[in-house]
UniProtKB/Swiss-Prot annotation:
Quaternary data: Heterodimer of a small subunit and a large subunit.
Source organism per UniProt: Dictyostelium discoideum
Cofactor: [4Fe-4S] cluster
Functional note: DNA primase is the polymerase that synthesizes small RNA primers for the Okazaki fragments made during discontinuous DNA replication.
4Fe-4S found in the keyword field: yes
Name of the protein this chain belongs to: DNA primase large subunit
Gene: prim2
Renumbered residue ranges of the record's region Disordered: 449-470
Keyword set, alphabetical order: 4Fe-4S, DNA replication, DNA-binding, Iron, Iron-sulfur, Metal-binding, Primosome
One Gene Ontology term from the biological process aspect of the record: DNA replication, synthesis of primer
CDD domains from the UniProt entry: PriL_PriS_Eukaryotic (cd07322)
Length: 470
């Protein structure tokens, strides 16, 4: 279990609301890697969709109540309804974890901008009076009647900027705050400075909140970046997971690693011998031998196959044949069809499940002694791992190297296995996702084919040249 952080107590419920809105106080609750992975990916997808929707609306110069509804529907789709009991936990956990992922990423500015768009939309859906009351603890003061009368002529400029009549407003429509808090509003002439303090019209209050949020996010990400080495040592599996996140704008709903080519059910067997990581090879071989794979194994192996390009129709046929030694077609439809459809997002909440990452597979590994075959083989019985290496024909030297590497980390051992399967490869970092293993293998064999074709082409040119010389 991971603890997300320590709770900071606020002085008032209103400031709590503001801190929650701006994600200022780190929440305090227990969570596991499965929650972190799913919540982070859902928020990442939400931000991607928010960014695309914002671009569309900007191009259309649109900003209507329907647009606000579109944003609200996006949030509900990925984070759930704000009325749900788990919404606050999912919202805060996913935000803070993505901060850690983005603090030193090239997508950092995208993250800040898109989170700001999300906040702006939430503000648009909130009552302005409620928002203002939430920020009383920030030192943003309403203008007193005395100040209003004293500076009425100056404040009249802001009223004209808002296309209103001075007779329609009073002191409650204005706020003052330190001028350094809102340089953008000053630059755009939406604020005036009187005796070192900035005065704004109430309609610009939301802009002030957004600007404050952006400044705070830059500060917070810098602080996290400075502390990331310690966090990496304390939660290495978390940092490993972040490396599998797609780039902003990829449009993928889960960490995907480059494979877009479809495969057929007939391809699974030969690919298992050349390009499957050990965890998937163990499950596949067991499935072939026993015509059985427990629920967790079916999830891990099934989503892996989907990730390497096995379409839904092919997956149905693959699993039907795999279980045919012990179940009829009718029993297969009753026992397994729904779960396969569910994995492909065709049942339930239409969630298109992603391949499991290494941290998640490790967290799901059965205890030593269990006869279950799912999970990470590098953290389970060394005797069983050694026997599997022998079965695969891995020589003594390579076998010892892999077994020794398990003492360092399962990722190091998995990378050793990859290197032995793919001599003279160009892999430059540790394997941290089964689908990364597969995709790197595909790249390896693609490169070999290209070199082979280039060599054949070169030989043919030499032959033709030799004939011409004769």
């Amino acid at each position: 279990m991971l603890r997300a952080g320590k709770k900071t107590n606020s002085q008032t419920s209103t400031s709590n609301d503001a801190c929650s809105l701006l994600y200022i106080n780190v929440p305090d609750f227990n969570c596991n890697m499965s929650q972190i992975e799913n919540y982070c990916i859902d928020r990442f997808n939400l931000l991607n969709e928010v960014s695309k929707l914002k671009d569309t609306l900007s191009a259309q110069k649109s900003n209507t109540s329907k647009d606000n509804e579109d944003f609200r529907n996006l949030s509900s789709r990925f984070l759930g309804s704000t009325k749900d009991e788990q919404f606050k936990i999912k919202d805060e956990l996913s935000h803070y974890c993505l901060r850690l992922a983005m603090c030193d990423s090239t997508d950092r500015n995208w993250f800040i901008t898109t989170e700001s768009i999300l906040l702006a939309n939430r503000l648009n859906q909130s009552d302005l009076t409620t928002i203002i009351s939430s920020f009383k603890g920030f030192g943003w003061s309403p203008v007193s009647q005395e100040e209003y009368e004293q500076y009425q002529d100056d404040l009249g400029y802001l009223v004209k900027k808002a296309n209103l009549n001075l007779n329609e407003v009073n002191n409650t429509h204005f706020y003052k705050l330190p001028f350094q808090d809102i340089p953008k509003l000053i630059d755009t002439k939406k604020a005036i400075i009187i005796k070192g303090e900035a005065y704004i019209y109430i309609s610009n209050f939301k802009d002030m909140v957004i600007h404050t949020f952006k400044n705070y996010m830059n500060f917070a990400l810098d602080r996290i970046k400075a502390d990331k080495t310690r966090i990496k040592e304390e939660f290495p599996e978390l940092i490993q997971f972040f490396t599998t996140l797609p780039k902003a704008g990829d449009g993928t709903n889960k960490p995907q690693l480059g494979n877009t080519k479809h495969i057929r059910k007939e391809d699974v067997s030969p690919l298992s011998k050349t390009s499957f990581p050990m965890c998937m090879r163990v499950m596949y071989d067991s499935l072939v031998e026993t015509s059985s794979l427990k629920y967790e194994g079916r999830l891990q192996f099934g989503t892996f196959l989907k990730g390497i390009g096995l379409p839904y129709d092919e997956a149905i046929n693959f699993w039907r044949i795999a279980f045919s030694k012990r179940v009829s077609n009718t029993d297969f439809d009753k026992e397994y069809l729904y779960n396969i459809r569910h994995n492909y997002g065709l049942e339930g909440k239409s969630t298109n499940y992603s391949p499991y990452s290494c941290p998640r597979i490790i967290s799901k590994s059965p205890h030593n002694g269990d006869k279950l075959v799912h999970g990470c083989p590098y953290i389970q019985s060394l005797e069983r791992l050694e026997q599997k290496l022998l079965d695969l024909g891995i020589d003594d030297f390579q076998r010892i190297q892999i077994l020794e590497a398990t003492k360092t980390s399962p990722n190091v051992a998995c990378t050793k296995h990859f290197n032995f399967l793919h001599p003279n490869n160009t892999l430059t970092k540790l394997i941290n996702h089964p689908n990364q293993f597969y995709d790197q293998s595909m790249e390896y064999y693609k490169t070999l084919e290209e070199k082979k074709s280039a060599k054949q082409s070169n030989n043919k040119e030499n032959e033709n040249q030799s004939i011409d010389e004769k």
